[in-house]
């Protein structure tokens, strides 16, 4: 996977965390540095950790499914993308009690928003991906997106939440199709 695809993938994976961070920002009257750090570290950290775990799960089974790896990557990315698009079309509002930045709440949210990254990590095992670069980009881009989302959410509310998830879903599907086409026609 080339550098620009990793950038797009990182942005797409960060959209769930971006949407949650918008809600967090919406629920806080006054943001402090600790809010930015908590949201950025939890979401960015888990977005980087989960593909790493997924990658090691994937390489465990790589020899068994090497002949269909491109299909697996395509299916995983497409399903995750479709799930994100579906969620973006559901008219969910931000939780008015989303102003919780405690350990349990943030841990649960970080895990929930990074499950997609775990599945993407599995697909990394079948692709030509620089894992260290990928997890660095995923983590740092998610960190930055969440900090921006916290501020935007604090200023503008929930208007952008569903659009972020929709965009993320579309990007994942496009990447899945790109991987499939490259493998079927250009390998």
Swiss-Prot record:
Single annotated GO MF: manganese ion transmembrane transporter activity
GO cellular component: plasma membrane
Membrane topology: Multi-pass membrane protein
InterPro entries referenced in this protein's UniProt entry, alphabetically: Mntp/YtaF, Put_MntP
Keywords tagged on the record: Cell inner membrane, Cell membrane, Ion transport, Manganese, Membrane, Transmembrane, Transmembrane helix, Transport
Coiled coil: none
Listed transmembrane segments: 3-23, 35-55, 56-76, 107-127, 129-149, 166-186
UniProt subcellular location: Cell inner membrane
Task of the protein: Probably functions as a manganese efflux pump.
Family per similarity comment: Belongs to the MntP (TC 9.B.29) family.
Record protein name field: Putative manganese efflux pump MntP
């Amino acid at each position: 996977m080339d550098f620009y695809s990793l950038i797009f993938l990182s942005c797409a994976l960060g959209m769930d965390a971006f949407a949650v961070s918008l809600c967090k920002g919406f629920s806080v009257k006054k943001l402090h540095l600790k809010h930015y750090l908590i949201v950025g570290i939890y979401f960015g950290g888990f977005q980087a950790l989960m593909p790493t775990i997924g990658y090691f799960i994937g390489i465990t089974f790589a020899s068994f499914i090497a002949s269909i790896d491109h299909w697996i990557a395509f299916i995983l990315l497409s399903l995750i993308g479709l799930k994100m698009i579906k969620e973006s079309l559901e008219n969910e509002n931000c939780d008015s009690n989303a102003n919780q930045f405690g350990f349990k709440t943030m841990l649960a949210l970080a895990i929930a928003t990074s499950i997609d990254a775990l599945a993407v990590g599995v697909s990394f095992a079948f692709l030509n991906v620089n894992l260290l670069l990928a997890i660095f980009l995923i983590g740092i881009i998610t960190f930055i997106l969440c900090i921006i989302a916290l501020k935007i959410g604090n200023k503008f509310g929930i208007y952008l939440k569903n659009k972020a998830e929709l965009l993320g879903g579309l990007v994942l599907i496009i990447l899945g199709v790109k991987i499939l086409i490259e493998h079927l026609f250009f390998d």
